[in-house]
Amino acid sequence: KEINSIYLNISWSDLGSWSEIFKILKSKIKKSFIKKNTFYRPWGLYRNYFRGENFLLKELIINRNSSISLQKHHYRSEHWTVSGGKPKITIGNKVFFKNPDETIFIPKGSVHRIENIYKKPVKIIEAQLGSILKESDIVRYKDIYGRIK
């Protein structure tokens, strides 16, 4: 099927070509997508990038001297890839220090945490796998921000 009209909420300009229109569309979609899918937390932020059946791809950014809760999930496992910084990761009673391009797997039901003890932000690409992929699937054990209920 052909599309013969596209609504753009932009100011008037002489675009000149379809490639210019696609550049504007791409930039608008990217900005609105990122803004809509960015969620701020006391430790930093996360962005949801892609959701499929039984999986979710996210980016976590943990600020310096911050950490996520010591927590577990009943319905999902997680696979983390470090894309920036040097996180301190706790899984059960084991502690790992990771570097960019290194990965770690968090099995469903495992107590875990990411800490940033350095100045540079920690960036993690998180792949969640499971039957329920909601923020409500968090059981917190320790939280420096007082979020344990």
Regions found by a protein language model. Name each.
Residues R113-K149:
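Double-stranded beta-helix
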